[in-house]
Curated annotation (Swiss-Prot):
Cofactor binding, per record: Binds 1 [4Fe-4S] cluster. The cluster is coordinated with 3 cysteines and an exchangeable S-adenosyl-L-methionine.
Residues given in the record as [4Fe-4S] cluster binding sites: C70, C74, C77
Protein name per its UniProtKB record: Cyclic dehypoxanthine futalosine synthase
Gene Ontology biological-process annotations: menaquinone biosynthetic process
Radical SAM core domain ranges (all copies): 56-288
Enzyme class: oxidoreductase
Function in brief: Radical SAM enzyme that catalyzes the cyclization of dehypoxanthine futalosine (DHFL) into cyclic dehypoxanthine futalosine (CDHFL), a step in the biosynthesis of menaquinone (MK, vitamin K2).
Pfam families: CofH_C, Radical_SAM
Keywords: 4Fe-4S, Iron, Iron-sulfur, Menaquinone biosynthesis, Metal-binding, Oxidoreductase, S-adenosyl-L-methionine
CDD domains assigned: Radical_SAM (cd01335)
Gene that encodes the chain: mqnC
InterPro entries found in the cross-reference section: Aldolase_TIM, CofH/MnqC-like_C, Cyclic_DHFL_synthase_mqnC, Elp3/MiaA/NifB-like_rSAM, F420, FO_synthase_su2, rSAM
Reported consequences of knocking out the gene: Cells lacking this gene require menaquinone-4 (MK 4) for their growth, and accumulate a small amount of DHFL.
Catalytic activity: dehypoxanthine futalosine + S-adenosyl-L-methionine = cyclic dehypoxanthinylfutalosinate + 5'-deoxyadenosine + L-methionine + H(+)
């Protein structure tokens, strides 16, 4: 372990563009003064984005949950229903999904996340049909969806290789993977919270296959389910090693565990200081990953704003619909003007981005800020009472 007095040279080296080791990252994450760690991370960000370092981005997207039926039963999840639970379980029909896509386009959204449970009947063919239908009706929408866990599941259902599954859903319309299912990659914490999911090594292997086929992804981390600091850094190390080989991870997105309505209820959550330290150490350690995304959805708008001073260059999405983390207690909401204002008050120029992080609209003049009260995050969508396999669903106004 490095003595605290010896940490500043490591911070200086990282700020100047040098690579740090996992051991050094653990020392910094655990012991470096928060302000010093944040300053080094911000220096890395400014160096990487010299010329556009004054800009912070956001995206308008919709998370379309196509089913909550799932065989995986992760202990941190409050969203899923067991396959035999006909009172709680539901699936959306294609017409409903296409209607939600139409609303997304109308509100200026550019991306959809297709997220749901590991349904025992949904193989590759299901995703091919749905992605192809979405692309036919809305070719302008980017389908940034799923992750290695869904690929492993659909390939098993359809009795095909993971490589074939990726090729087929990519050809049908999938543009990139959302990094879903990473949770915690090291073996011990992963088995504790998601014992039925593939291993962390397998998750990375599938993402590496996808990158090799030209399908990029983001990477994520679920914080605060009982993992150690060393396991958090090991998660980063595993991502960095794959990124050295593929370059296919566009961004890293840590988010915090929400404790309501799940089997881990009462578990000590990651503190907001731990979250900011993770944003900072991720920016310092992941020297080969372009973007670090701050999350206001699980931590709140003020902490999301603070993340822009700790290495984040992006504030995530104005998520027009989200049901998964909200079911576990995340109740933060925002709208487009609030996100623009948060970024501006952090001393940055806000910009709406594409999935691939190109700037679509730079809001450099407040007088020209967009005004549309319908562009609101976190509109929940839940099933009407009933227990059929495909009940009618409705969109509820935010409360």
């Amino acid at each position: 372990m490095t003595e605290k007095a010896d940490l500043q040279p490591i911070l200086d080296r990282a700020a100047a563009g040098g690579r740090i080791t996992p051991e050094e990252a653990l020392d910094l994450y655990r012991d470096a003064p928060l302000h010093a760690l944040g300053a080094a991370a911000d220096a890395v960000r400014r160096r990487r984005y010299a010329g556009t370092e004054h800009i912070a981005t956001y995206i308008i997207e919709r998370n379309i949950n196509y089913t909550n039926v799932c065989v995986t039963a992760c202990k941190f999840c409050a969203f899923y229903a067991a396959p035999k639970d006909t009172k709680k379980g539901w699936s959306r029909d294609l017409d409903d999904i296409l209607r939600r896509c139409a609303e997304t386009v109308e509100l200026g959204g550019t991306q959809i996340m297709f997220q749901g449970g590991h349904h025992p009947d949904y193989g590759v063919e299901y995703y091919e049909e749905h992605f192809a239908a979405i692309k036919k009706e809305f070719p302008q929408l980017v389908i940034h969806s799923l992750g290695a866990s869904e690929v492993e599941h659909m390939a098993r259902i359809s009795k095909v290789s993971v490589e074939e599954a990726i090729r087929r859903i990519h050809a049908a319309g999938l543009d990139s993977f959302a990094g879903a299912g990473a949770e915690l990659l090291p073996e011990r914490p992963r088995k504790a919270i998601a014992p039925l999911k593939e291993s962390g090594e397998r998750w990375l292997e599938i993402m590496e296959i996808a990158h090799g086929l030209g399908v990029e992804s983001t990477s994520t981390m679920l914080m605060g389910t009982g993992e150690t600091n060393a396991e958090r850094i090991e998660h980063l190390r595993m991502i960095r090693d794959v990124q050295d080989r593929t370059g296919g991870f566009r961004a890293f997105i840590p988010y915090t565990y929400q404790p309501e309505n799940n089997h881990l209820k009462g578990r000590t959550q990651a503190t907001l200081f731990e979250y900011l330290r993770m944003i900072a150490i991720a920016r310092v350690f992941l020297d080969n990953v372009a973007h670090i995304q701050g999350s206001w959805l699980t931590t709140g708008k003020e902490v999301g704003q603070l993340s822009l001073h700790y290495g984040a260059d992006d504030l995530g999405s104005i998520m027009l619909e989200e049901n998964v983390v909200s079911s576990a207690g995340a109740k933060h909401r925002s709208n487009r003007l609030e996100i623009i204002d948060l970024i501006r008050k952090a001393g940055r120029v806000p910009a709406q981005r594409a999935t691939t992080y190109e700037h679509l609209v730079v809001h450099d003049d407040p007088a020209n800020d967009p005004v549309d009260e319908r562009v609101v995050s976190h509109i929940s969508s839940t099933a009407i009472e009933g227990g059929t396999a495909h009940p009618e669903l409705k969109l509820l106004a935010p409360n």
